[in-house]
């Protein structure tokens, strides 16, 4: 059970990191 929670946390962390990088690069390009 704890392994599943850890996996979900890891996936959400990776997704948020990728989204942050993507939007960060887009905002830098717009400026």
UniProtKB/Swiss-Prot annotation:
User: Where are the bilayer-spanning segments?
Assistant: 3-23
Q: Which domain of life is it from?
A: Eukaryota
Q: Which InterPro entries match?
A: Cyt_b6/f_cplx_su6
Record membrane topology: Single-pass membrane protein
- Where would you find this protein in the cell? Plastid, Chloroplast thylakoid membrane
Per the record, the GO terms for biological process are: photosynthesis
Pfam short name (any one) = PetL
One GO CC term of this entry?
A: chloroplast thylakoid membrane
Q: Cystine bridges: which residues? A: none
Q: Which UniProt keywords apply?
A: Chloroplast, Electron transport, Membrane, Photosynthesis, Plastid, Thylakoid, Transmembrane, Transmembrane helix, Transport
Molecular-function GO terms, alphabetical: electron transporter, transferring electrons within cytochrome b6/f complex of photosystem II activity
State where it is primarily located: plastid
State the oligomer form and interacting partners: The 4 large subunits of the cytochrome b6-f complex are cytochrome b6, subunit IV (17 kDa polypeptide, PetD), cytochrome f and the Rieske protein, while the 4 small subunits are PetG, PetL, PetM and PetN. The complex functions as a dimer.
Functional description taken from the UniProt entry:
Component of the cytochrome b6-f complex, which mediates electron transfer between photosystem II (PSII) and photosystem I (PSI), cyclic electron flow around PSI, and state transitions. PetL is important for photoautotrophic growth as well as for electron transfer efficiency and stability of the cytochrome b6-f complex.
Q: Which family does it belong to?
A: Belongs to the PetL family.
Please report the name of this protein according to its UniProt entry: Cytochrome b6-f complex subunit 6
List the lineage, top down. Answer: Eukaryota, Haptista, Haptophyta, Prymnesiophyceae, Isochrysidales
